[in-house]
Structure formats: C-alpha cells, structure tokens
Amino acid sequence: MEPPTSHVTNAFSDSDSASVEEGDADADADVEALRRLSDNLAAAFRSPEDFAFLADARIAVPGGGGGGGDLRVHRCVLSARSPFLRGVFARRAAAAAGGGGEDGSERLELRELLGGGGEEVEVGYEALRLVLDYLYSGRVGDLPKAACLCVDEDCAHVGCHPAVAFMAQVLFAASTFQVAELTNLFQRRLLDVLDKVEVDNLLLILSVANLCNKSCMKLLERCLDMVVRSNLDMITLEKSLPPDVIKQIIDARLSLGLISPENKGFPNKHVRRIHRALDSDDVELVRMLLTEGQTNLDDAFALHYAVEHCDSKITTELLDLALADVNHRNPRGYTVLHIAARRREPKIIVSLLTKGARPADVTFDGRKAVQISKRLTKQGDYFGVTEEGKPSPKDRLCIEILEQAERRDPQLGEASVSLAMAGESLRGRLLYLENRVALARIMFPMEARVAMDIAQVDGTLEFNLGSGANPPPERQRTTVDLNESPFIMKEEHLARMTALSKTVELGKRFFPRCSNVLDKIMDDETDPVSLGRDTSAEKRKRFHDLQDVLQKAFHEDKEENDRSGLSSSSSSTSIGAIRPRR
C-alpha cells in the first residue's frame, strides 16, 4: 500500500501540469488575438481602396510611388501610436479653419511633417510606407527589394547605397515621429552593418544620426569616429555636414595628429580661390587665377571639384579649356569619371567620355565607374518600365552610357540608310537630321537632351520644317526656312547640320538601343497614303502606334506652350524651339 503522501504529491503534480498546459493555451490564444488585431489594423492601411471611406488624412510624398504620392491614413490610429503625430493633428485641429482635401480629408506634406530635417534627408515613398505600416500593425515587414537592392550582381546588398539609404530614411522618419522601438531597431541594424558600408555612405548615416540626436547617440558616436579616421577630405566633409559636426571632426583629427594645425586639412588659399570661382560659375575667373602661376587645374583637383559640386555646364567649360588631365586621380584614387559616376549626371559622364576619360580605370579598391554607378542604383529605378515618351531614370541612363563606353564598339557610318540615300542633297540631309532629332526628343527625351546639350544644338538656329506656315513672332529669329527654293547652304545651315550630326553620332555611340529604334522608324517607307490593302497588319499597327505617340506628344507640347503664353498657331509638322537648359 502506497503512502498517502505519494497520492498528494501526484495530485499536485497533475494539477501543476494542467495549469501549465492551460497557461500555454491562454498565451497562445493571446498571441493569436494580437496577431489578428495586427492584421486587421494593417488591412486598413494596406488596402486603401477598401477603407477609403474611413481615411481622414493623406500624407503627400514628393515623387510619390507609382500612380500617386498620397498615402491615406487614419488620424486616430497615428495619434494613438505616435506622440509627434498626435501633436501635429491636435495643432491643426485647433487651427481648424479648413485644410481639408476635396474628399474632406486632411492633406499633409511629408516635408512639412519632417521639419527642417526633411530638406537634408529625403524620405522616400517606400520608407514612409514601412514606418506607417509599423504604426498600424506593430510589426516590421520585409524590406522592399526594389528600394533596398542595388543593380550590382556581385553585391551582397548589406552596405550598398540603396540598402543604407533606405534604413537611414526609416530611422529618420521613426525618430521624428517619436516611435522609440522602431528607432532603436533600425539604429541597431545600421550599427551591425557599419563596417561593411562604403566610406562615402557614412556621411549619409552620420547626417541622419546627427539629426536624430539623443535617440541615436550610439550610432552618432560610432559614425563620427569612423569618419574622423577615414580618408574623406575636408572639402567633401564641409559640403556634406553641418558646421558643428565639422568642428568635432577637425578637433578629433588634430588630437590624433591626422592633420596639421596650420591648414587643418584644407587645401591652400590658391586652390580655395579656384574652388570659390567654380562655385560662382565663373570659369573666366578660373582662367585668370591660373595665369598667376600659383597652381594648376590638376593640382587643385578642379575637375573633380566641378564634377562633384558644380553645375554640369561648368564641367563642360572647364573641359573646353583643355588644361586638365581628364584621367587625373585625386588622393583617394578616384578619377574624374569615378566622381561623375557617383553624382549620376548623364551629361557630365558623356562630356568626360568624349574628352577621353577611360571607363576601364579602377579605384584603389578595384571598382570601375560602371560598378560605382551600379552600387548606387536601386533595382526599382533600373528595371522599372519607362512609359514611351517619358524621360528615362538618370541612374539607369548612366549605367547604360558607361557599359556602352566599355564595349568600345560604337556604331559607325551614316546615321541610317535614309541619310545615306540623301546623298549630296544638303536640304535632304538637313531635313533628315531635323526629323530624326525631333523624333528622338519625343520618344527618348532624356537621352536626346543629353546628346543635344553636348552637341550644343540650342546654340544654333532651328529650321522651319512646315509647309509655308509662319512661325510665331517669338520664334521668327530662331528658325530658318528650309522650304526656300532654290536652297542655298548658308553659315547657319552648316552650324545647325554640324550640331545635329554630332547629336546623332553621340546617340549612336552612347545610346545604341535608342538609335536602333530611330533607325527602323526613319528607314521605314511606310506612308499614310501607302497604307492600302497590301500593307501587313503588323506594319499598319506599328504606324498607328507611332502616330498615337506623336499626336500625344504634340498635344502635350501645345498645352505647355499655351500655358507659357506662346502662340499655338504654328504648324503641327514643326517642332518648337528647344528650351535652354535651366
């Protein structure tokens, strides 16, 4: 017979086991209830069309995402989750004399929400979506690949620019909205990858950490130490960071003996004078300073400076001086083309390549210009579909230009069969070039603008391709009639033909994909009159598609001209004067 105590012990053991099981079941039920609550609240944000009748505010993001830049939100949810947003909505409610949208909802500009920091850190559409989604669901979703992955196939996508920039944007928005848990999470994520981040990208993280201030002190201190010990020059730092941070860097470098007390890491006064002249867009002053013999463009790294910090026209004017080595390296081992790849300005890259910049040159760590550009470009920008007639993304254009330059196989010869057939007919050649470049402007506006800027087309007189229609007064001094009979080659004709020919050559060299499309269209003998029964359905469809594109472009140009106060009475077969680059 078992002792009574054993029964008591077993009874308690069974009771404890049952209690644990019941506790686990209760915990699981609580977790499931919280998960459903999270999903239900998230649905109100993730399915804006289904919950549009409940949304009472919209946040407008510059540039937007896809079809629009407005994100529909619910003030009660955001106010409950973010003290900052609660204060914003409370102040606007107190002020309350309107401010609603057409549907009665309140519209807030993201830059206004982010305050002064919004001018320094541009929070993108996808980054804001992630922050708002967290406020609704309490969970951090997967990072969007289109916004966080670069184009370089060899990249691990841990410390590349798109990944770093996205995390920095989320961190800044979360800190501004006073969402402590999300701020801490992304601060930890950035701290974990800092050692893998390219030194130039440290400046972005440091800027954001400085704006977040007390909420990101660990990140701020770590970034500051890494920048102090880096090879980033003082000019780059001065252009990227606020004065108080610059002072901390100078003091730290002085204490470590990394710079001398005399110049504190800055270039001498003669170089600084050249830089100030470039900042003032005064290339003539640069020329005068060079005559003093105190320095030269290479020693001053003037081309590097202009490419990184000045308007593209300054780079072109400096190159035209022919006084600098276009393949000169700065102390960090970057050629001018490497700097241009970082800036991602197609016109500057093409200008350098036409002057002999070598795309195969590598940095000290083994990267070519095209690899630099790829590491900076988001997959969403590169692989996204561009609507016909709309500008191509600059990032993608830069990569295509650099890849084509590396192939070293630009298309040679005449622009196309049609131009070759024009033979000695100067009028025919001019008409062909005008039509080709005009078509390029409609179908590939960004590529055409780059080539035309390099060729300086806007410095020549446009030809009137109409059939006797008089151009408006605003254009009479900027057009030349090609319909004069007999046609006589004049100086302005020659200048125009030279510029247009160079435009076509640049297009074939750097934009072969676009040039091939234009070749097929210009060489196509399809004519509206010849579209009879013998015309293939495919050819007929192609003609009508092209006709739709041209008609759409014409109507858009006409509306824009009407808004600008220009006369809309010019012939529909005439292309308007090219606007000067702003």
Swiss-Prot record:
Q: Note the Pfam families from the entry.
A: DUF3420, NPR1_like_C
Q: Which portions of the chain have biased composition (kind: Polar residues)?
A: 1-12
A molecular function GO annotation: zinc ion binding
Please list the residue ranges that the record marks as compositionally biased, kind Low complexity. Answer: 564-574
Region Disordered: list its residue ranges.
1-27, 525-544, 551-582
Subunit structure of this entry? Oligomer in an uninduced state; disulfide-linked. Forms activated monomer upon changes in cellular redox potential. Interacts with TGA2.2. Interacts with NRR.
Query: What organism does the UniProt record list as the source?
Result: Oryza sativa subsp. indica (Rice)
Q: What is the lineage of its organism?
A: Eukaryota, Viridiplantae, Streptophyta, Embryophyta, Tracheophyta
What SUPFAM superfamilies is this protein classified in?
Answer: Ankyrin repeat, POZ domain
Q: What is this protein called?
A: BTB/POZ domain and ankyrin repeat-containing protein NPR1
- Residues the entry annotates as binding Zn(2+): C150, C155, H157, C160
